[in-house]
Regions:
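Conserved helicase RecA-like core
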Residues: 1-289
């Protein structure tokens, strides 16, 4: 960053003051750095336990957890602050690596709710020294049914823990969650979620059987490049991807049946332009940069 973004300018001082905060900011506003940088700054002072987990960052998807972990890795290159990402969809080796990282007291744990609770239930994680509790994309976590998981984790945290909540939208359920877990919070609203102005939006009112014909028509008018098609279930994703492949389109599918390494490879191929069309479940919509 050459200069702070609006959300960073408004939230970083509040977090450094030790206050709870709820910030409404959409993806692309620099929100990750808005909470990561002040947390790293505080942990780098050496005033927190060296062999304990000092910060928990919860994210709705493993893709977002990975992105946050990568940013922290870059920010802490010259800083004695450690981090570990904890998420599902991995093999036994990855589970052991996650377990070892938490048992050794990684300063920052970035986790999806379900996997973090699994480690808690097995007694592999101690939250008694946590000073920072961050919820990134809190609205998405509630949409995915993680309210009870969030509360289970929250109840294990010290009463003195500072809580930081980021959400792209501010529906009543987010207000309710904020009232439950935040203490006299500051509130920041920056660019409440709305579609980018550069994107043309078109709605097609049709039956399921007509959707493929519409896609054919769209792709016949212009060659598909960097196209993402979201579908509501992995079954539909598989079916659509197979159909498009038979139609000679360069397409790949992204869904929960893929191993983590396979999902990463698909995203790499898509970002590098070797895949024209990515068909994915809508749960992947958060976490794609």
């Amino acid at each position: 960053f050459l200069e702070t973004t609006p959300v960073q300018e408004l939230t970083i001082p509040v977090i450094l003051e030790g206050k709870d905060i709820i910030a409404c900011a959409q993806t692309g506003t620099g929100k990750t750095a808005a909470y990561v940088l002040p947390v790293i700054n505080e942990l780098s002072k050496g005033l927190h336990p060296a062999n304990a987990i000092n910060a928990i960052i919860m994210a709705p998807t493993r893709e977002l957890a990975q992105q946050i972990d990568q940013q922290i890795e870059g920010f802490t290159y010259f800083v004695p602050v450690s981090a570990v990402a904890v998420y599902g969809g991995t093999d036994g080796i990855a589970w052991e690596q996650q377990k070892r990282g938490m048992e050794m007291g990684a300063d920052i744990v970035i986790a999806t709710p379900g996997r973090l609770l699994s480690h808690i239930k097995l007694g592999t994680v101690d939250l008694s020294q946590v000073s920072f509790f961050v919820l990134d994309e809190a609205d998405r976590m509630l949409d995915m049914g993680f309210y009870d998981d969030i509360m289970q984790v929250y109840k294990l945290l010290p009463a003195t823990c500072q809580t930081i909540m980021f959400s792209a939208t501010m529906p009543p359920k987010i207000r309710t969650l904020a009232q439950t877990i935040l203490k006299n919070p500051e509130e920041v609203k920056i660019a409440i979620s709305r579609p980018p102005e550069t994107i043309m939006q078109t709605a097609y009112v049709c039956y399921d059987m007509q959707k493929l014909r519409i896609l054919e028509d769209l792709f016949s008018k212009s060659r598909p490049q960097r196209v993402i098609i979201f579908s509501s279930s992995k079954m539909k994703v598989k079916e659509l991807a197979s159909t498009l492949k038979r139609m000679k389109f360069n397409v790949a599918a992204m869904h929960s049946d893929l191993e983590q390494s396979q999902r990463e490879e698909v995203m790499k191929e898509f970002k590098n332009g070797r895949i024209d069309i990515l068909v994915a479940t809508d749960v992947v919509s958060r976490g794609i940069d």
